[in-house]
Amino acid sequence: MTSSLRFLMRSNGRKRPNVTRPAKAKQPAARRNATLNRPWKLVSLSHPHTDRLGQVIGRALRGGETIALYGPLGAGKTALVRGIAQGLGASPMTVTSPTFVVIHEYDQGRLPLAHIDLYRIRTARELESTGLIEYFSGQTVTAIEWADRGLAALPQDRIDITLSHRAARSRTIQVRATGPKSHETLARLRRQYRRTGRAHRVSSRRALNKEAPTRS
């Protein structure tokens, strides 16, 4: 009996089957792409909740991102930009809607922020006159309200955020990444948002415990 055959023999004399396990199937590329392209859906129950989301977005940014904001009047687009500014380290109190001047720039934070409002833009010539495309290079973070009025000029790799009314104070928010860089940003944003949510719940429980009456 050869040594190789003895290796395959059990102590009871039965041969051990020489089984080759199949390699684990990889997730199809189409399914991976579908997962990446699926929007991240949230519900904001209040203005502070929307502001907190904006702060997390600001902290997740690395520079050069374009954030396109969509939604009707009063949906919370400017409030979200205030949170982004605060997350970048700028004062949210200085952030106002640039409806009439089109562009506000903020450079007090760790990254420069360009806040753009295209509500009054009606033609391609008006869009070109804003100098919008000049902000899409370098480290400037660009947040664009009413981005649907300038789609032709927007970079293909960006973060799209759609806000819609849900009730009197609550909002439905959908966040979608449209390219490689924005996919990385969105993944980082979701991780930070989960951590922030856990920290917020812990701090809320601690506050409730402090307020709870002591039993005698």
Task: Please report, for each region that a protein language model flagged, where it lies by residue.
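Conserved lysine of the Walker
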Residues: 77
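N-terminal pre-Walker A segment at the start of P-loop NTPase domains
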Residues: 34-53
